[in-house]
UniProtKB/Swiss-Prot annotation:
GO terms (BP aspect): pantothenate biosynthetic process
Record carries keyword Nucleotide-binding: yes
Residues that, per the record, bind beta-alanine: 58
Residues that coordinate or bind ATP: 27-34, 147-150, 176, 184-187
Physiological role: Catalyzes the condensation of pantoate with beta-alanine in an ATP-dependent reaction via a pantoyl-adenylate intermediate.
GO cellular component: cytosol
Keyword Oxidoreductase annotated: no
Tree of life domain: Bacteria
Descriptive protein name: Pantothenate synthetase
Positions annotated as active site in the UniProt record: 34
Protein encoded by which gene: panC
Organism annotation: Helicobacter pylori (strain Shi470)
Lineage: Bacteria, Pseudomonadati, Campylobacterota, Epsilonproteobacteria, Campylobacterales
Pathway participation: Cofactor biosynthesis; (R)-pantothenate biosynthesis; (R)-pantothenate from (R)-pantoate and beta-alanine: step 1/1
Similarity section: Belongs to the pantothenate synthetase family.
């Protein structure tokens, strides 16, 4: 496995690849959720490249950039064990050669980025677009793999590819859950045993909402009340029902409904969702 630290070495390596290339962009602290993305890429492509880069532009002023876990040696060992061909591990100065005031300004589309996570984390998705477009430009993948857990991010990346006419297939990947049903996240390491038990209210709320939908309930307001009752011990940022354009829904639309939740357990903010 190649560990590529510079854009020059990445470009040289990429030129040598003649067949399909799968790409899994990450911020490191890899877990079984990332592993599932990597394994799918390995299955569907001749070559797989993973990036590990904690992107500063998608963190707000009061967020956990400096504290974000960076177990690079462990991440590299995981990738090598899975059979990844190369891992791109650039420094910030490689990805952002210019100071902020000299950079080209890139903005996520407002109709997808200013609600939900975008409303809670101003500028977050602008930072995501900044780094993902740069990585796409450098890696030039056949396919890129993103988890459905970050649903809003996935929708924005899909729109980015369509709007900028990029010849990249975006492959959405199912949410991976731990044995207790908590969605896997690099931030789960911040939870102590008591907090982890409290956090299980999140998947339980979504599961109960799904059961109610399966039994025929379509009124989003009733379903929201059901979910909020289960989440009452947590600090809920939002529990919303939207279509795939992130427009609010009053009634469930089969194959076009997202139930999105963000809640805090102690100081840890967790996301989860249900694709109906």
């Amino acid at each position: 496995m190649r560990a590529l630290e510079t854009i020059a070495t990445l470009r040289e390596y990429r030129k040598s690849l003649k067949e399909s290339v799968g790409f899994v962009p990450t911020m490191g602290a890899l877990h079984k959720g990332h592993q599932s993305l990597i394994e799918r890429s390995l299955k569907e492509n001749s070559h797989t490249i993973v990036s590990v880069f904690v992107n500063p532009t998608q963190f707000g002023a009061n967020e956990d950039f400096s504290a974000y876990p960076r177990p690079l040696e462990k991440d590299l060992a995981l990738c090598e064990g899975l059979g990844v061909n190369a891992v791109f591990v650039p420094k910030t100065s490689e990805m952002y050669p210019y100071e902020i005031e000299k950079r080209l300004k890139l903005y996520a589309p407002t109709f997808l980025s200013h609600s939900l996570e975008g409303a809670m984390r101003e500028g977050h998705f602008d930072g995501v677009v900044q780094v993902v477009l740069r990585l796409f430009h450098l890696v030039n993948p056949t396919r890129a793999y993103f988890g459905k857990k970050d649903a809003q991010q996935l929708l924005i990346i899909q729109h980015l590819v369509q709007d900028l006419l990029l010849d990249i297939e975006i492959a959405p990947c199912e949410i991976v859950r731990d044995s207790d049903n908590l969605a896997l996240s690099s931030r789960n390491v911040y939870l102590n045993a008591t907090q982890r038990k409290q956090a299980l209210a999140i998947p339980k709320a979504l599961e109960n909402i799904k059961q109610a939908i399966d039994k025929g309930e379509k009124a989003c307001e009733k379903l929201k009340k059901l979910g909020l009752k289960i989440l009452e011990t947590l600090e809920v940022d939002y529990l919303e029902f939207c279509n795939h354009k992130l427009e609010p829904l009053k009634t469930i639309e089969p194959t076009n409904t997202l139930v999105l939740v963000a809640a805090r357990v102690g100081k840890t903010r967790l996301l989860d969702n249900l694709w109906v």
